[in-house]
Amino acid sequence: MKLDLKILDARMRDYLPKYATTGSAGLDLRACLDAPVTLKPGDTALVPTGLAIHLADPGYAALILPRSGLGHKHGIVLGNLVGLIDSDYQGELMISTWNRGQTEFALNPFERLAQLVIVPVVQARFNLVDDFAQSERGAGGFGSTGRG
């Protein structure tokens, strides 16, 4: 798939999103910062990437996801848990960053902060019904299938 990428900050030419390995599903996104940003425990920040994308095809969307190492080792996760980029969005990719850890974290300029994953999208059309055809599960939820 081809993806239109617009560089909004010239410094990002040296830090284009890329897959870390041939098996990577996510493209690394970096913090486009002039200076380090310190996040105290509980702090949030909206971090620019200096990049914009345009998927154009309504059959695709992009997800901004946290990097597992930052979350596990430092408590740095996405403030909105997952960022959804619609196919028609053309603005700058911003990363809602939250320090849910117990210590301060310094985010450095151009540090890898999140990952971008392209996913297929199916847009549903609703069919209004009075009731559903019976299924094995029915309306059971919240532990109805058992534990373990």
From Swiss-Prot:
InterPro entries associated with the record: dUTPase, dUTPase-like, dUTPase-like_sf, dUTPase_trimeric
A GO molecular-function annotation: magnesium ion binding
Top enzyme class: hydrolase
GO-annotated biological processes: dUMP biosynthetic process; dUTP catabolic process
Keywords associated with the record: Hydrolase, Magnesium, Metal-binding, Nucleotide metabolism
Presence of the UniProt keyword Hydrolase in the record: yes
Keyword Methyltransferase: no
Domain of life of the native organism: Bacteria
CDD domains on file: trimeric_dUTPase
Catalytic activity: dUTP + H2O = dUMP + diphosphate + H(+)
Entry cofactors: Mg(2+)
Associated pathway: Pyrimidine metabolism; dUMP biosynthesis; dUMP from dCTP (dUTP route): step 2/2
Binding site for substrate: 67-69, 80, 84-86, 94
Function field: This enzyme is involved in nucleotide metabolism: it produces dUMP, the immediate precursor of thymidine nucleotides and it decreases the intracellular concentration of dUTP so that uracil cannot be incorporated into DNA.
Family: Belongs to the dUTPase family.
Cross-referenced PANTHER family: DEOXYURIDINE 5'-TRIPHOSPHATE NUCLEOTIDOHYDROLASE
HAMAP family: dUTPase_bact (MF_00116)
Descriptive protein name: Deoxyuridine 5'-triphosphate nucleotidohydrolase
Native source organism of the sequence: Burkholderia mallei (strain ATCC 23344)
